[in-house]
Amino acid sequence: MKALVFQEPGRTTWRDVPDPGIEDASDVIVRVDAVTICGTDLHIVKGDVPEVTPGRVLGHEAVGTVVEAGGDVRTVRPGDRVLVSCISACGRCRFCREARYGQCRGGGGWVLGHTIDGTQAEYVRVPFADLSVYPLPNSVDSADAVLLADIFPTAYEVGVRNGGVSPGDTVVVVGAGPIGLAAIATSRLYSPERVIAVDLADARLDAARSLGAEATVRADEEPQQLVADLTDGLGADVVMEAVGVPETFETCTRMVRPGGRVANIGVHGKPATLHLEDLWIKDVTITTGLVDTSSTPMLLRMLANGRLPSAELVTHRFELGEMEEAYDVFSRAADTGALKVVLHAPR
Protein backbone atom coordinates (compact mmCIF):
# COMPACT_ATOMS: atom_id res chain seq x y z
CA MET A 1 0.00 0.00 0.00
CA LYS A 2 0.96 3.67 -0.21
CA ALA A 3 1.55 5.70 2.95
CA LEU A 4 3.13 8.93 4.15
CA VAL A 5 6.34 7.95 5.93
CA PHE A 6 8.45 10.11 8.25
CA GLN A 7 12.02 9.87 6.99
CA GLU A 8 13.86 12.41 9.13
CA PRO A 9 13.15 15.90 10.47
CA GLY A 10 11.95 18.00 7.56
CA ARG A 11 11.41 15.07 5.18
CA THR A 12 8.53 12.71 4.47
CA THR A 13 7.77 10.49 1.47
CA TRP A 14 4.59 9.04 -0.01
CA ARG A 15 5.76 5.52 -0.84
CA ASP A 16 5.02 1.82 -0.82
CA VAL A 17 5.01 0.07 2.56
CA PRO A 18 3.75 -3.38 3.62
CA ASP A 19 0.01 -3.72 4.19
CA PRO A 20 -0.91 -3.88 7.90
CA GLY A 21 -2.23 -7.11 9.36
CA ILE A 22 -4.04 -8.23 12.49
CA GLU A 23 -1.53 -8.41 15.36
CA ASP A 24 -3.95 -8.82 18.27
CA ALA A 25 -7.48 -10.15 18.57
CA SER A 26 -8.68 -6.64 19.47
CA ASP A 27 -7.42 -5.13 16.18
CA VAL A 28 -9.27 -4.07 13.07
CA ILE A 29 -7.85 -3.23 9.66
CA VAL A 30 -9.52 -0.18 8.12
CA ARG A 31 -9.39 0.87 4.47
CA VAL A 32 -8.98 4.64 4.64
CA ASP A 33 -11.69 6.63 2.84
CA ALA A 34 -10.91 10.10 4.24
CA VAL A 35 -8.07 11.51 6.30
CA THR A 36 -6.94 14.91 7.50
CA ILE A 37 -3.75 16.59 8.71
CA CYS A 38 -3.26 17.96 12.22
CA GLY A 39 -0.98 20.68 13.53
CA THR A 40 0.65 17.95 15.61
CA ASP A 41 1.68 16.24 12.37
CA LEU A 42 3.56 19.39 11.41
CA HIS A 43 5.39 19.31 14.75
CA ILE A 44 6.35 15.69 14.06
CA VAL A 45 7.68 16.51 10.59
CA LYS A 46 9.79 19.30 12.09
CA GLY A 47 11.34 16.80 14.50
CA ASP A 48 9.66 18.19 17.62
CA VAL A 49 8.30 14.78 18.73
CA PRO A 50 11.31 12.51 19.35
CA GLU A 51 9.15 9.44 20.01
CA VAL A 52 8.32 9.38 16.28
CA THR A 53 11.18 7.54 14.60
CA PRO A 54 12.16 7.29 10.92
CA GLY A 55 9.95 4.86 9.03
CA ARG A 56 6.79 5.70 10.96
CA VAL A 57 3.55 6.13 8.99
CA LEU A 58 2.01 9.43 10.12
CA GLY A 59 -1.56 10.47 10.91
CA HIS A 60 -4.07 9.90 13.71
CA GLU A 61 -7.46 10.86 12.19
CA ALA A 62 -9.49 8.95 9.59
CA VAL A 63 -12.81 7.67 8.34
CA GLY A 64 -12.79 4.33 6.59
CA THR A 65 -14.28 0.89 6.10
CA VAL A 66 -13.44 -2.15 8.22
CA VAL A 67 -11.95 -4.88 6.01
CA GLU A 68 -10.79 -7.30 8.72
CA ALA A 69 -11.51 -7.70 12.43
CA GLY A 70 -9.79 -9.68 15.16
CA GLY A 71 -11.64 -12.41 17.01
CA ASP A 72 -12.29 -10.32 20.14
CA VAL A 73 -13.87 -7.34 18.34
CA ARG A 74 -17.56 -6.98 19.18
CA THR A 75 -18.68 -3.50 18.11
CA VAL A 76 -17.86 -3.51 14.38
CA ARG A 77 -17.42 -6.03 11.59
CA PRO A 78 -16.04 -6.06 8.04
CA GLY A 79 -17.99 -3.72 5.79
CA ASP A 80 -18.81 -1.23 8.56
CA ARG A 81 -17.97 2.41 7.94
CA VAL A 82 -16.18 3.85 10.96
CA LEU A 83 -14.53 6.89 12.49
CA VAL A 84 -10.97 6.14 13.62
CA SER A 85 -10.33 8.07 16.83
CA CYS A 86 -7.04 9.81 17.54
CA ILE A 87 -7.02 8.02 20.90
CA SER A 88 -6.95 4.25 21.38
CA ALA A 89 -8.18 2.71 24.63
CA CYS A 90 -7.51 -0.71 26.14
CA GLY A 91 -10.65 -0.44 28.28
CA ARG A 92 -9.09 -2.30 31.20
CA CYS A 93 -6.54 -0.04 32.91
CA ARG A 94 -7.39 2.36 35.74
CA PHE A 95 -7.54 5.38 33.45
CA CYS A 96 -9.75 3.71 30.84
CA ARG A 97 -12.16 2.66 33.60
CA GLU A 98 -12.42 6.35 34.46
CA ALA A 99 -12.99 7.18 30.75
CA ARG A 100 -9.63 8.99 30.69
CA TYR A 101 -8.58 7.18 27.55
CA GLY A 102 -5.85 9.66 26.67
CA GLN A 103 -3.91 8.41 29.71
CA CYS A 104 -4.38 4.69 28.88
CA ARG A 105 -1.62 2.55 30.40
CA GLY A 106 -2.62 -0.66 28.66
CA GLY A 107 -1.07 0.11 25.29
CA GLY A 108 -3.45 2.83 24.13
CA GLY A 109 -3.58 6.60 24.36
CA TRP A 110 -2.19 8.60 21.47
CA VAL A 111 -0.42 5.83 19.59
CA LEU A 112 -1.52 6.16 15.95
CA GLY A 113 1.10 8.04 13.94
CA HIS A 114 3.13 8.35 17.13
CA THR A 115 4.34 5.00 18.46
CA ILE A 116 2.59 2.79 15.87
CA ASP A 117 1.82 3.35 12.19
CA GLY A 118 -0.95 5.84 11.56
CA THR A 119 -3.81 6.77 9.27
CA GLN A 120 -2.20 8.71 6.42
CA ALA A 121 -2.16 5.59 4.31
CA GLU A 122 -4.42 3.39 2.23
CA TYR A 123 -4.94 1.01 5.18
CA VAL A 124 -4.40 1.28 8.93
CA ARG A 125 -4.36 -1.19 11.82
CA VAL A 126 -6.34 0.14 14.78
CA PRO A 127 -5.78 -1.54 18.17
CA PHE A 128 -8.50 -1.95 20.82
CA ALA A 129 -11.18 -1.45 18.20
CA ASP A 130 -14.16 -1.68 20.55
CA LEU A 131 -13.22 1.67 22.13
CA SER A 132 -11.14 3.16 19.32
CA VAL A 133 -13.42 3.13 16.26
CA TYR A 134 -17.02 4.31 16.05
CA PRO A 135 -19.66 3.15 13.54
CA LEU A 136 -20.93 5.95 11.31
CA PRO A 137 -24.48 6.34 9.98
CA ASN A 138 -24.78 6.52 6.21
CA SER A 139 -26.21 10.03 6.49
CA VAL A 140 -22.91 11.46 7.79
CA ASP A 141 -20.40 12.67 5.20
CA SER A 142 -16.85 11.34 5.59
CA ALA A 143 -15.26 14.81 5.36
CA ASP A 144 -17.56 16.08 8.11
CA ALA A 145 -17.01 13.06 10.33
CA VAL A 146 -13.22 12.99 10.12
CA LEU A 147 -13.05 16.24 12.08
CA LEU A 148 -14.52 14.34 15.02
CA ALA A 149 -11.44 12.13 15.19
CA ASP A 150 -9.51 14.83 17.04
CA ILE A 151 -10.25 18.55 16.84
CA PHE A 152 -13.89 18.57 17.94
CA PRO A 153 -13.48 16.29 20.96
CA THR A 154 -10.26 18.11 21.84
CA ALA A 155 -11.91 21.52 21.67
CA TYR A 156 -14.97 20.34 23.56
CA GLU A 157 -13.28 18.32 26.31
CA VAL A 158 -10.08 20.29 26.89
CA GLY A 159 -11.57 23.70 26.17
CA VAL A 160 -15.31 23.90 26.75
CA ARG A 161 -15.76 21.18 29.36
CA ASN A 162 -12.57 21.90 31.31
CA GLY A 163 -13.38 25.59 31.11
CA GLY A 164 -16.84 25.00 32.56
CA VAL A 165 -18.64 27.14 29.97
CA SER A 166 -22.13 27.99 31.27
CA PRO A 167 -25.15 29.99 30.08
CA GLY A 168 -24.51 33.72 30.25
CA ASP A 169 -20.72 33.44 30.31
CA THR A 170 -18.28 35.64 28.47
CA VAL A 171 -15.91 33.27 26.69
CA VAL A 172 -12.65 34.28 25.02
CA VAL A 173 -10.90 31.95 22.57
CA VAL A 174 -7.33 32.96 21.80
CA GLY A 175 -6.35 31.40 18.48
CA ALA A 176 -8.90 30.94 15.69
CA GLY A 177 -7.26 28.02 13.96
CA PRO A 178 -9.13 24.71 13.58
CA ILE A 179 -9.06 23.87 17.30
CA GLY A 180 -10.07 27.38 18.33
CA LEU A 181 -12.90 27.46 15.81
CA ALA A 182 -14.15 24.09 17.06
CA ALA A 183 -14.02 25.53 20.59
CA ILE A 184 -16.14 28.48 19.47
CA ALA A 185 -18.69 26.17 17.83
CA THR A 186 -18.99 23.87 20.85
CA SER A 187 -19.07 26.78 23.31
CA ARG A 188 -22.20 28.00 21.53
CA LEU A 189 -23.97 24.80 22.64
CA TYR A 190 -24.01 26.20 26.20
CA SER A 191 -25.60 29.58 25.40
CA PRO A 192 -22.86 31.93 26.61
CA GLU A 193 -23.67 35.63 26.55
CA ARG A 194 -20.84 36.23 24.12
CA VAL A 195 -17.83 34.55 22.55
CA ILE A 196 -14.81 36.70 21.69
CA ALA A 197 -12.22 35.40 19.22
CA VAL A 198 -8.61 36.61 19.14
CA ASP A 199 -6.23 35.95 16.25
CA LEU A 200 -3.71 37.67 13.99
CA ALA A 201 -5.33 36.52 10.73
CA ASP A 202 -8.36 38.45 9.49
CA ALA A 203 -9.58 35.44 7.49
CA ARG A 204 -9.66 33.33 10.64
CA LEU A 205 -11.53 36.04 12.50
CA ASP A 206 -14.08 36.03 9.67
CA ALA A 207 -14.43 32.26 10.13
CA ALA A 208 -14.88 32.78 13.87
CA ARG A 209 -17.76 35.18 13.23
CA SER A 210 -19.41 32.70 10.87
CA LEU A 211 -19.26 30.05 13.61
CA GLY A 212 -20.90 32.29 16.19
CA ALA A 213 -18.34 34.62 17.74
CA GLU A 214 -20.09 37.87 18.62
CA ALA A 215 -16.86 39.86 18.80
CA THR A 216 -13.44 39.47 17.22
CA VAL A 217 -10.19 41.31 17.70
CA ARG A 218 -6.72 41.05 16.25
CA ALA A 219 -4.12 39.87 18.73
CA ASP A 220 -2.05 42.98 18.02
CA GLU A 221 -4.93 45.38 18.73
CA GLU A 222 -5.28 45.25 22.53
CA PRO A 223 -7.63 42.29 23.02
CA GLN A 224 -7.31 42.68 26.80
CA GLN A 225 -8.84 46.14 26.56
CA LEU A 226 -11.76 44.89 24.44
CA VAL A 227 -12.51 42.15 26.96
CA ALA A 228 -12.39 44.68 29.80
CA ASP A 229 -14.71 47.05 27.92
CA LEU A 230 -17.26 44.27 27.30
CA THR A 231 -17.23 43.00 30.88
CA ASP A 232 -17.25 46.24 32.90
CA GLY A 233 -13.60 45.70 33.67
CA LEU A 234 -14.04 42.27 35.26
CA GLY A 235 -12.61 40.02 32.56
CA ALA A 236 -13.94 36.87 30.93
CA ASP A 237 -15.50 33.93 32.76
CA VAL A 238 -13.61 31.45 30.58
CA VAL A 239 -10.51 32.02 28.47
CA MET A 240 -9.23 29.26 26.18
CA GLU A 241 -5.68 29.15 24.83
CA ALA A 242 -5.66 27.46 21.42
CA VAL A 243 -2.26 28.46 20.04
CA GLY A 244 0.42 26.84 22.15
CA VAL A 245 3.00 29.60 22.65
CA PRO A 246 4.04 31.23 25.95
CA GLU A 247 2.91 34.73 24.99
CA THR A 248 -0.67 33.72 24.24
CA PHE A 249 -0.94 31.70 27.45
CA GLU A 250 0.18 34.73 29.44
CA THR A 251 -2.33 36.89 27.54
CA CYS A 252 -5.08 34.48 28.58
CA THR A 253 -4.20 34.81 32.26
CA ARG A 254 -4.52 38.59 31.98
CA MET A 255 -8.02 38.45 30.46
CA VAL A 256 -9.74 36.16 32.98
CA ARG A 257 -11.95 37.53 35.75
CA PRO A 258 -11.51 36.76 39.46
CA GLY A 259 -12.87 33.26 40.00
CA GLY A 260 -12.65 32.51 36.28
CA ARG A 261 -11.01 29.67 34.39
CA VAL A 262 -8.19 29.47 31.87
CA ALA A 263 -8.45 26.29 29.79
CA ASN A 264 -5.26 25.53 27.92
CA ILE A 265 -5.87 23.57 24.70
CA GLY A 266 -2.71 24.49 22.77
CA VAL A 267 0.25 22.13 22.55
CA HIS A 268 3.23 23.87 24.14
CA GLY A 269 6.83 23.13 23.27
CA LYS A 270 8.40 25.85 25.42
CA PRO A 271 7.97 26.95 29.06
CA ALA A 272 5.42 29.65 29.80
CA THR A 273 5.64 32.07 32.70
CA LEU A 274 2.95 31.55 35.32
CA HIS A 275 2.35 34.73 37.30
CA LEU A 276 1.12 33.15 40.51
CA GLU A 277 1.81 36.40 42.34
CA ASP A 278 -1.18 37.84 40.45
CA LEU A 279 -3.36 34.77 39.98
CA TRP A 280 -3.59 33.20 43.43
CA ILE A 281 -5.48 36.07 45.00
CA LYS A 282 -7.96 36.10 42.08
CA ASP A 283 -8.98 32.44 42.61
CA VAL A 284 -8.17 31.69 38.98
CA THR A 285 -8.35 28.05 37.90
CA ILE A 286 -6.02 26.85 35.13
CA THR A 287 -6.62 23.54 33.38
CA THR A 288 -4.61 21.57 30.85
CA GLY A 289 -5.30 18.27 29.17
CA LEU A 290 -4.88 15.71 26.45
CA VAL A 291 -8.15 14.73 24.82
CA ASP A 292 -9.79 11.52 26.07
CA THR A 293 -12.41 11.28 23.27
CA SER A 294 -15.03 10.17 25.80
CA SER A 295 -17.33 12.74 24.18
CA THR A 296 -17.02 11.29 20.67
CA PRO A 297 -20.31 9.30 20.69
CA MET A 298 -22.23 12.39 21.82
CA LEU A 299 -20.55 14.59 19.22
CA LEU A 300 -21.33 12.05 16.50
CA ARG A 301 -25.01 12.15 17.45
CA MET A 302 -24.95 15.94 17.26
CA LEU A 303 -23.26 15.81 13.86
CA ALA A 304 -25.88 13.37 12.56
CA ASN A 305 -28.61 15.75 13.78
CA GLY A 306 -27.08 18.77 12.06
CA ARG A 307 -25.99 20.46 15.30
CA LEU A 308 -22.23 20.51 14.65
CA PRO A 309 -20.89 22.71 11.81
CA SER A 310 -17.76 20.68 11.07
CA ALA A 311 -18.10 21.16 7.29
CA GLU A 312 -17.41 24.89 7.70
CA LEU A 313 -13.85 24.15 8.80
CA VAL A 314 -12.89 22.22 5.64
CA THR A 315 -11.22 24.62 3.21
CA HIS A 316 -9.23 22.32 0.92
CA ARG A 317 -9.79 18.84 -0.52
CA PHE A 318 -7.29 16.48 -2.14
CA GLU A 319 -7.00 12.90 -3.29
CA LEU A 320 -5.10 10.60 -0.96
CA GLY A 321 -2.16 10.38 -3.36
CA GLU A 322 -1.74 14.17 -3.16
CA MET A 323 -0.60 13.92 0.46
CA GLU A 324 2.61 15.89 0.02
CA GLU A 325 0.78 18.73 -1.76
CA ALA A 326 -1.82 18.77 1.02
CA TYR A 327 0.93 19.05 3.65
CA ASP A 328 2.42 21.98 1.76
CA VAL A 329 -0.92 23.82 1.64
CA PHE A 330 -1.68 23.09 5.30
CA SER A 331 1.78 24.12 6.49
CA ARG A 332 1.45 27.51 4.73
CA ALA A 333 -1.95 28.36 6.19
CA ALA A 334 -1.12 32.06 6.47
CA ASP A 335 -0.69 32.18 2.68
CA THR A 336 -3.24 29.56 1.59
CA GLY A 337 -6.05 30.27 4.06
CA ALA A 338 -6.16 26.60 5.01
CA LEU A 339 -8.12 25.55 8.07
CA LYS A 340 -8.63 21.81 7.68
CA VAL A 341 -7.61 19.87 4.60
CA VAL A 342 -9.34 16.56 3.84
CA LEU A 343 -7.94 13.88 1.57
CA HIS A 344 -10.21 11.28 -0.03
CA ALA A 345 -9.30 7.87 -1.38
CA PRO A 346 -10.20 7.42 -5.06
CA ARG A 347 -13.73 6.10 -5.37
Set out the residue ranges of the language-model regions:
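C-terminal hydrophobic helical "lid"/dimerization subdomain
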Residues: 1-3, 250-254, 293-347
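Short Gly/Pro-enriched turn/cap motifs at secondary-structure boundaries
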Residues: 7, 19-20, 53-59, 111-117, ...
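Glycine-rich beta-strand-centered segment in the early N-terminal region that forms part
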Residues: 18-35, 48-97, 137-139
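NAD(P)H dinucleotide-binding glycine-rich loop of Rossmann-like/cofactor-binding domains
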Residues: 92-174, 311
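Mid-domain Rossmann-like dinucleotide-binding core that forms the NAD(H)/NADP(H) cofactor-binding site
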Residues: 138-221, 225
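Glycine-rich cofactor phosphate-binding loops and adjacent beta1-alpha1 units
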Residues: 162-166, 206-285, 346
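Conserved acidic E/D residue at the C-terminus of a beta-strand in Rossmann-like folds
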Residues: 199, 266, 290
